Amino acid sequence: MKQYDLAEGMRMYIARLREQGRYSSAKSYQDALNSFLRFCGQEMILYTRIDREMLLRYQDYLRDRECSWNTVSTYMRRIRRVYGLAMENGEAPFSRYLFKGIFLGVKSKQKKALPAESLRLLMTAPLAAPELRKTQRALCLMFLFCGMAFVDFAHLKKSDIRNGVLRYNRQKTGTPMLVEIQPVARELWAALMTDTLRDSPYLFTFLSGTKTGEEAFREYTSALADFNRSLKELANACGVTEIVTSYSIRHSFATTLKEQGVPIEMISELLGHQSIKTTQIYLKSFSLDRMSAVNKACFESIYNEVSKVG
């Protein structure tokens, strides 16, 4: 009787993802496989060897190496997906409680939104270095473009701008987006476009427009790493002590709107989220001062009126 192997199953699944152009997902599965192989200490992992005790030990192994709970969840869900497919194909034994006690959820992380003053410094601090000014303009534009994700910003095309409106589809979900280009955005974008490659379809120079397939994915991940390094340098130059990444811009946009009383439904639509639950993860909790003031006002609106009647 043939013995089927999880590692081989994952490699086949990764190959299928690459064929579909889902390079980010393929990398996630490859990372999970590499980690599980290191834990097992061998290249072949028979499905018949995998049981709940083994997965619990693997979970402890990851935590001992200071992996976050979200990393644990990601790796375990990748294993569960491939094991489930093997089970459907009769290649792995049925096990109802295989993942019982294994963390498969999402731990809410510390929110990435920046304090308003830090955000203001990043946007407005005078800078001498041309590269830092370029990063500053990009940050301002991403904020002006409704907290646009870097992946969408980098992939904006010249043809996406028509009649003063930016029309594009989100890279992650395909959601169609419309953003009116404000006058200040035109100035910032014109300054960035001076560097745009003449023959490139892209609005900005993060991507060359000459790569396809997995090469294009690698070019994008390199551009993201470069941009995050530039943001770190910008923060240092502006005296901002918080960690600043491309995610900070998006989270800060959402939290600023929340603090201004904008309904979460509108914030969700502006961000292009398909679920309000996703938006809630982005939003930083209100400050204690703000919550105390609202609580006090709520009480007084009733108590003071009752006191007058009494």
Region annotations inferred by a language model:
Residues R198, L207-E214, A297-G310:
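C-terminal secondary-structure termini that scaffold catalytic or DNA-interacting sites
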Residues H155-A191:
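Conserved tyrosine-mediated DNA breakage-rejoining catalytic core shared by Y-recombinases
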Residues A113, R170-G174, L271-K296:
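Catalytic-site neighborhood detector that most strongly recognizes the C-terminal catalytic loop/helix
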Residues L119, Q182-T241:
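Active-site/catalytic core of tyrosine-dependent DNA strand-transfer enzymes
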Residues P130, N228-E269:
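Short, basic (Lys/Arg/His-rich) helix/loop patches that form interaction surfaces
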Residues G101-F150:
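Basic, Lys/Arg- and aromatic-enriched nucleic-acid-binding interface segment
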Residues M12-S24, L33-Q110, A125:
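N-terminal core-binding DNA-recognition domain of tyrosine recombinases/integrases
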Residues G84-E91, M142-N163:
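Short, charged phosphate-coordinating catalytic segments
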